[in-house]
C-alpha cells in the first residue's frame, strides 16, 4: 500500500451486520433506493429486510417454513378427503369378505359404512370414477365424490342386493399414489390383473396401514422438487426501484404533470425477487404472499442474471442456454424470448431506456449484444472479446462498459455503435464494474476485487491513476485474517454509499463528508455579481452565477493536478483564494484579481476566518503544521524543526515525538502571527466565524495504529493512536481534509514488507505510477460517543464553549446570526446573537447547505429543502426530490408565479422538481433562484418565485410589511400555515388580514401564542356572526358548537391567563367583555379582579349597576366590601 496520501478520509461504517453467519456462495444482497433498507439472505435462506440506520429487522421471512405450512395444509385436507389408494385398499378388502361370507349382508353393510365399494349385481368391475364434474357413478355405493375443485360431495348410499356368485372385484392401484394436489391431468386409473381372494384378504390390512405413508412419501418427493436451494440473487422490485431506474431525459412538461397521477395501492406491486437454484419467487414484502415464476427451461438450471425495466412490466432473465426470457409481471407469463446469442452462458444483463427499451447482454462467449425489447430483435452485436465478467451502463454518456476475463475494460458507445476505448486493469482481477461519479475521485469507474478486498476507481480515458480503498485495512486492521470482498453494490441515488459483502458480514461504507462537489463563491464588486470557483479538467475554473445556465466555464491560469483532491477556501473579503492539496499537503494563497501567488508551503490543513467588523482588515488565515521533537537517548539532545517530507531514522535509539502547531496571522500589511501548540492528535481545522479544531482520541488496545508522518515514530506520549475498537468518528469537510494516515499505511504494511519509503516525497507524488490507496480508518458513525471538536476564538485562540462531537461540516451565515452544524444523521441550528445557543435540531443527514437571509437551504440524500430556523419549528419547503414530490404541491405551477419570470432548471436532464442524481453542492441564492452543482460539475437553477416561499423568506427576515403584501397572492389554503408562522414569531395581529382562515381560528392562534389583546379584538366579530345566525367554523373540534356562552367562557379564560401574565388591563377588558356573554361567572371574576387590585371604588360601582339584575352577584360583592 502506498502511503503518499496524507488525507484522513471521512469514510465511515454506518452499518454492519452483527452476529450473523451469512452464506457467501452467491451473495444475494440489495439496497433500497428510497428507504434505508437492505435485503439479504442469511445462512438459513431466510429473507431479511433490515433498516441500516437503526439496525431494526423489518422482515424475516422463511420460504422453507412457508412450504412446510403449505404441506401441513395439504395433509390436513388429505385426511378429510380419501384418496384413490384408500378406495383401492378398501375394495380389495371387500373381495375377501364376500368370498368368505357369501350371502352375508352384515359384512357388506359394515364395509359400506366405512366408505368402501360394494358389489353390484350387474357389474363385475366396480370402479370409483373421479372426474372433472365430481359426479358419482350409479354403479358405486356409498362413495365420496371429489370434484376437480377439491369440493366434497355428500355420500350417496345406494341399496343393492349382493350376489354371492359374482366374480371378484379387481384391486385398484393409483398411478404414482396420486392425491388431490398431485394427480395426472387426465385423471386416469390403472387396473391391476385380478388377484386371488386369499391374497387380497392377507394384504387388506397392510394396504390400509401403508396408504397414508405412501401418500406422504409422494408429497414429500414433490415438495423436495420444490425446495428452494441456495439463493443466487435477491432484489427489491417495487415502484421506487422502477422510478429510480427511469433516467431518460425529461424534456416534456407532461413528465411533471404525470407525477400527480394516482399511485397504486401500497403493497400491490412491492416485491422482493428471489432467484434460487430451483425456484424463482416474487415475495410481496407487505402481505408476505408468494408468486412463483414457472419457466420450464429453469427447472433444472436457474438463470444467471436478472434485470428490470422502469416503465414496463418486464423482468429479463438470462439463462444458461444463451436465451433471454422476458417475464410479464402483469400477465404472469413469458412475453418474449430473445434468441440469437451465440453459445455461452449469459452472465449479465443491463436495461437501457432511451427513446425505447433496449437490453444489453454479455456472456462467456465474449460477445456484447444489444436487443430491441419491443421487437424482440437483435439490434447490434459488438466484436468478440474475452469472456464477459460484468456489464455496466452509464446513462450520462450513453456508454456500455464490459469487464472481461483478460483484465480489460471494453467501452462501447451506443450512439455510434463502436468501441470507444480499451482500458487495462493491470494485474488485478476484478469481478464487478459500475459507472461512478464522485467529486472526490477523478476516476469514473468503480470496480470490486475479491482478494485483497479492495474497491478501485479507474478512469475511462486512462489519464488518471487508479485510486483504491483497501477494505481489508479499513475494516480489519488487526490483520489476523484476510478479508474477502464478495460483492459491492452502489446505492442507486447515493453513490457515496457502498454496500459491501465482506467475509460473512454486510457493511455499508460511506464517504459522504467528501462526496459533494468542491467549490467556493465570492462577490465581485466590479461586476456586481457572484462568482463560483471550482476544479475541473486539470484547471481552476470560474463561472458567473447571474446566468449560470448559459454562461461559459472560464478557465483560469491556475493548473491543478488530475491526481489530487483539493480543498478550496476563500477569504472573507473575497480577494484571496487558498488551494490546499489533500494528498501532498501543499497549499498556495492566490490573489484573485491578478492570480498572483502570495504564499505557498506545506500544511496539514488551512482555513480562513469569518467576516470581521472590517472585512478588508479583520480577516485571518490559519494553518496547521506538524513538527517533531526528536530525543537522542545517548546525547540527550533535543531538536525542534518543521517535519520534512521524508524522515529517515538513522539511529535506532532515536525517539520521535510529533506535535501540531497552529499558526494564525492577519492577512494584511501587519501580518501579525499567533501560534498555539496543540496535541499530536489535533490535525484538522475548520474556518468561519470561529476556528474549529478536530481532535482524534487515542485508546490503548490491541491493533492500535500510530498516526505520524512516516519515519520512526516512537511510542512516546505525543504519538497519536487509534485502535480497531475506537469509537471516534473521523470526519471531514468538503473535499476531504487532514493528514494522519502515513503511519497508518506504514503500519498496515509492516507485515508485508511493503513499507520502505512509505512516506514518499510529496513532490514526486503525481509522478508515481503506483495506485493511491485509502488509509485504514476505523469508525462507527456515532458522533455521541466522542466529543473531540473544540471551537476557538480567532483572535485570542481561547476555547469557546464546551467540546462538541466532531461535525461533518459547519455552515456559517453570512450575516453572522446563525450557523448549522451537520452530523451524520442529524444537524443543529445555532443562533450566535446575543449568545451562542441552540435553536432547533433536525433528524436529517445533510450533504450540502447554504444560508440566505436567515433561511437555510440544504440537500439530503433524496431531496432539497429549506427551513426557517426558530425555536418553534415550522414546516419545511421541499424544493425537489428524487421522486419528484414537492411541497407545496403547486410549487412550480404557472398560477403560483413560479415559472412566470424564471428559466427552466435544465432543458436536458431534469425539471425543477426532480433532484439531480448523486451528491450535489448548493452554491448560492440569487435573483434566478437556488443554484446548485452536481458531481459532473453541471449547473442547475431551481426557481424560488412561489409566493408562499417568498412570504416565508420575507417573514423570516422580519420584513413583515413586504411579507403581508406577498400574502395576498398566496392561495388561501396556505393561510393557516402562514398565520402559524407569523404568530410564533410575535406577529399575531397580521393574521387578521388573512381571509383564508376563520375568525375563530384566528382567535385560537392568538390564544396559543398568548396574544390576549389581539384575541379580544376578534371576539366581537365572532359574537356578531353568532347573533346574525352565520356559521362559525371550529377547525380544532368540529363536534363542539360555538355559542355566546362558550365565547363568554373563553373571554373569562383569557382574563385569567392575562392575570397570570400580570397583564391586568387586558384581564379587566376580557372580564368586562364576558359580562355580556356569560354574565353570572363574568361578574364574579370581575369582582375578584377588583378585590385583588384593591379597586374598591370600581367594586362599589359594579355592585350598584348589577344590584337589581343580578342580586346574587351583588350580595357577593357586599361581602367583599364588608
Swiss-Prot record:
Residue stretches of biased makeup (Polar residues): 178-190
Pfam families: WD40
Keywords: Repeat, WD repeat
The keyword Repeat belongs to this UniProt entry's keyword annotation: yes
PANTHER family listed in its UniProt record: TRANSDUCIN_WD40 REPEAT-LIKE SUPERFAMILY PROTEIN (PTHR45521:SF2), TSET COMPLEX MEMBER TSTF (PTHR45521)
Annotated organism of origin: Dictyostelium discoideum
Positions with biased composition (Low complexity): 88-126, 191-215
Statement: the UniProt record of this protein carries the keyword Nucleus: no
Protein name according to UniProt: TSET complex member tstF
Coiled-coil intervals, chain numbering: none
High-level lineage: Eukaryota, Amoebozoa, Evosea, Eumycetozoa, Dictyostelia
Gene: tstF
Region (Disordered) location: 88-131, 178-215, 731-775
Amino acid at each position: 500500500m502506498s502511503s503518499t496520501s496524507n488525507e484522513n478520509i471521512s469514510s465511515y461504517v454506518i452499518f454492519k451486520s452483527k452476529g450473523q453467519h451469512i452464506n457467501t456462495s452467491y451473495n444475494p444482497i440489495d439496497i433500497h433506493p428510497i428507504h434505508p433498507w437492505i435485503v439479504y439472505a442469511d445462512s438459513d435462506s431466510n429473507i431479511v429486510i433490515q433498516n441500516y440506520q437503526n439496525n431494526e429487522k423489518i422482515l424475516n421471512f422463511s420460504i422453507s417454513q412457508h412450504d412446510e405450512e403449505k404441506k401441513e395444509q395439504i395433509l390436513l385436507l388429505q385426511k378429510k378427503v380419501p384418496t384413490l389408494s384408500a378406495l383401492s385398499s378398501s375394495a380389495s378388502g371387500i373381495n375377501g369378505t364376500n368370498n368368505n361370507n357369501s350371502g352375508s349382508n352384515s359384512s357388506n353393510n359394515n364395509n359400506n359404512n366405512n366408505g368402501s365399494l360394494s358389489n353390484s349385481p350387474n357389474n363385475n368391475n366396480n370402479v370409483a370414477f373421479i372426474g372433472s364434474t365430481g359426479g358419482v357413478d350409479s354403479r358405486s355405493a356409498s362413495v365420496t365424490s371429489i370434484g376437480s375443485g377439491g369440493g366434497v360431495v355428500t355420500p350417496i348410499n345406494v341399496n343393492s342386493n349382493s350376489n354371492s356368485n359374482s366374480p371378484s372385484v379387481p384391486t385398484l392401484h393409483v398411478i404414482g399414489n396420486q392425491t388431490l394436489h398431485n394427480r395426472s391431468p387426465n385423471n386416469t386409473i390403472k387396473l391391476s390383473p385380478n388377484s386371488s381372494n386369499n391374497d387380497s384378504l392377507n394384504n387388506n390390512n397392510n394396504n390400509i396401514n401403508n396408504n397414508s405413508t405412501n401418500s406422504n412419501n409422494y408429497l414429500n418427493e414433490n415438495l423436495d422438487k420444490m425446495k428452494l436451494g441456495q439463493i443466487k440473487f435477491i432484489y427489491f422490485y417495487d415502484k421506487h426501484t422502477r422510478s429510480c431506474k427511469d433516467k431518460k431525459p425529461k424534456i416534456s412538461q407532461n413528465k411533471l404533470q404525470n407525477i400527480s397521477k394516482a399511485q397504486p395501492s401500497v403493497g400491490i406491486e412491492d416485491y422482493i425477487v428471489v432467484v434460487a437454484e430451483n425456484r424463482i419467487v416474487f415475495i410481496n414484502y407487505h402481505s408476505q404472499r408468494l408468486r412463483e415464476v414457472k419457466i420450464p427451461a429453469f427447472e433444472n438450471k436457474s438463470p444467471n442474471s436478472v434485470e428490470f425495466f422502469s416503465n414496463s412490466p418486464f423482468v429479463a432473465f438470462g439463462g444458461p442456454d444463451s436465451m433471454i426470457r422476458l417475464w410479464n409481471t402483469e400477465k404472469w407469463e413469458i412475453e418474449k424470448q430473445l434468441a440469437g446469442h451465440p453459445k455461452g452462458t449469459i452472465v449479465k444483463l443491463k436495461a437501457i431506456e432511451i427513446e425505447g427499451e433496449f437490453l444489453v447482454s454479455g456472456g462467456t462467449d465474449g460477445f456484447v449484444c444489444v436487443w430491441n425489447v419491443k421487437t424482440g430483435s437483435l439490434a447490434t452485436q459488438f466484436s468478440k472479446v474475452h469472456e464477459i465478467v460484468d456489464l455496466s451502463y452509464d446513462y450520462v454518456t450513453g456508454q456500455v462498459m464490459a469487464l472481461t476475463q483478460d483484465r480489460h475494460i471494453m467501452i462501447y458507445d451506443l450512439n455510434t455503435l463502436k468501441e470507444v476505448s480499451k482500458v487495462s486493469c493491470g494485474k488485478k482481477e476484478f469481478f464487478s464494474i459500475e459507472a461512478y461519479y464522485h467529486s472526490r475521485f477523478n476516476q469514473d469507474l468503480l470496480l470490486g476485487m475479491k482478494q485483497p478486498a479492495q474497491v478501485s476507481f479507474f478512469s475511462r480515458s486512462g489519464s488518471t491513476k487508479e485510486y483504491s480503498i483497501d477494505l481489508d485495512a479499513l475494516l480489519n486492521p488487526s490483520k489476523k485474517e484476510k478479508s474477502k470482498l464478495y460483492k459491492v453494490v452502489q446505492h442507486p441515488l447515493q453513490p457515496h454509499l457502498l454496500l459491501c459483502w465482506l467475509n460473512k458480514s454486510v457493511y455499508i461504507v460511506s464517504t459522504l463528508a467528501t462526496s459533494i462537489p468542491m467549490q467556493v463563491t465570492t462577490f465581485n464588486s466590479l461586476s456586481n455579481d457572484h462568482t463560483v470557483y471550482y476544479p475541473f479538467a486539470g484547471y481552476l475554473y470560474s463561472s458567473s452565477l447571474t446566468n449560470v445556465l448559459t454562461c461559459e466555464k472560464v478557465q483560469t491560469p491556475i493548473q491543478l493536478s488530475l491526481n489530487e483532491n483539493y480543498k478550496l477556501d476563500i477569504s472573507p473579503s473575497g480577494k484571496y483564494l487558498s488551494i490546499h492539496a489533500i494528498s501532498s499537503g501543499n497549499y498556495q494563497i492566490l490573489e484573485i484579481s491578478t492570480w498572483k501567488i502570495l504564499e505557498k508551503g506545506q500544511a496539514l490543513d488551512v482555513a480562513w476566518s469569518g467576516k470581521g467588523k472590517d472585512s478588508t482588515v479583520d480577516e485571518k488565515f490559519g494553518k496547521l503544521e506538524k513538527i517533531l521533537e526528536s530525543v537522542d537517548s545517548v546525547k540527550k539532545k533535543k531538536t525542534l524543526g518543521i517535519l520534512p517530507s521524508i524522515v529517515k531514522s538513522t539511529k535506532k535509539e532515536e525517539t520521535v515525538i510529533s506535535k501540531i502547531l497552529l499558526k494564525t496571522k492577519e492577512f494584511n500589511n501587519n501580518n501579525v502571527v499567533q501560534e498555539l501548540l496543540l496535541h499530536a492528535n489535533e490535525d484538522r481545522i475548520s474556518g468561519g466565524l470561529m476556528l474549529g479544531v478536530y481532535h482524534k482520541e487515542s485508546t490503548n488496545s490491541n491493533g492500535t495504529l500510530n498516526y505520524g508522518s512516516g519515519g520512526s515514530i516512537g511510542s512516546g506520549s505525543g504519538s497519536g493512536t487509534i485502535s480497531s475498537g475506537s469509537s471516534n468518528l473521523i470526519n471531514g469537510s468538503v473535499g476531504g481534509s487532514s493528514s494522519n494516515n502515513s503511519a497508518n499505511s506504514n503500519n498496515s504494511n509492516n507485515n508485508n514488507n511493503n513499507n520502505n519509503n512509505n512516506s514518499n516525497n510529496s513532490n514526486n507524488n503525481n509522478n508515481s505510477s503506483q495506485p493511491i490507496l485509502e488509509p485504514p480508518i476505523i469508525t462507527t458513525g456515532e458522533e455521541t460517543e466522542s466529543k473531540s471538536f473544540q471551537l476557538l476564538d480567532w483572535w485570542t485562540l481561547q476555547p469557546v464553549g464546551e467540546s462538541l462531537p466532531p461535525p461533518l461540516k459547519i455552515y456559517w451565515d453570512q450575516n453572522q446570526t446563525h450557523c448549522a452544524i451537520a452530523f451524520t444523521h442529524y444537524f443543529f441550528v445555532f443562533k450566535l446573537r446575543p449568545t451562542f445557543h441552540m435553536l432547533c435540531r433536525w433528524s436529517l443527514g445533510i450533504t450540502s447547505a447554504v444560508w440566505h437571509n436567515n433561511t437555510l437551504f440544504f440537500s439530503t440524500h433524496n431531496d432539497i429543502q429549506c427551513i426557517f430556523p426558530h425555536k418553534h419549528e415550522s414546516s419545511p419547503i421541499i424544493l425537489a426530490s428524487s421522486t419528484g414530490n414537492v411541497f407545496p404541491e403547486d410549487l412550480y405551477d404557472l398560477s403560483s408565479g413560479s415559472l412566470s419570470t424564471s428559466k427552466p432548471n435544465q432543458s436536458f436532464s431534469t425539471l425543477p422538481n426532480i433532484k439531480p442524481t448523486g451528491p450535489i453542492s448548493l452554491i448560492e441564492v440569487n435573483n434566478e433562484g437556488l443554484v446548485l452543482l452536481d458531481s459532473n460539475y453541471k449547473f442547475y437553477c431551481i426557481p424560488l418565485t412561489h409566493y408562499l416561499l417568498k412570504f416565508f423568506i420575507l417573514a423570516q427576515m422580519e420584513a413583515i410589511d413586504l411579507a403581508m403584501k406577498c400574502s395576498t397572492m398566496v392561495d388561501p389554503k396556505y393561510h393557516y400555515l402562514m398565520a402559524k408562522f407569523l404568530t410564533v414569531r410575535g406577529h399575531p395581529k397580521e393574521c387578521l388580514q388573512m381571509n383564508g382562515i376563520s375568525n375563530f381560528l384566528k382567535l385560537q392562534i392568538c390564544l396559543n401564542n398568548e396574544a390576549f389583546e389581539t384575541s379580544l379584538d376578534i371576539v366581537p366579530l365572532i359574537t356578531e356572526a353568532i347573533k346574525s345566525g352565520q356559521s362559525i367554523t371550529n377547525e380544532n373540534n368540529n363536534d363542539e358548537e360555538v355559542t355566546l356562552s362558550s365565547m363568554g367562557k373563553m373571554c373569562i379564560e383569557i382574563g385569567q391567563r392575562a392575570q397570570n401574565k400580570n397583564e391586568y388591563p387586558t384581564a379587566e377588558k376580557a372580564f368586562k367583555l364576558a359580562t355580556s356573554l356569560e354574565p353570572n361567572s363574568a361578574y364574579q371574576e370581575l369582582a375578584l379582579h377588583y378585590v385583588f387590585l384593591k379597586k374598591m371604588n370600581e367594586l362599589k360601582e359594579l355592585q350598584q349597576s348589577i344590584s337589581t339584575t343580578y342580586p346574587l352577584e351583588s350580595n357577593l360583592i357586599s361581602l367583599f366590601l364588608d
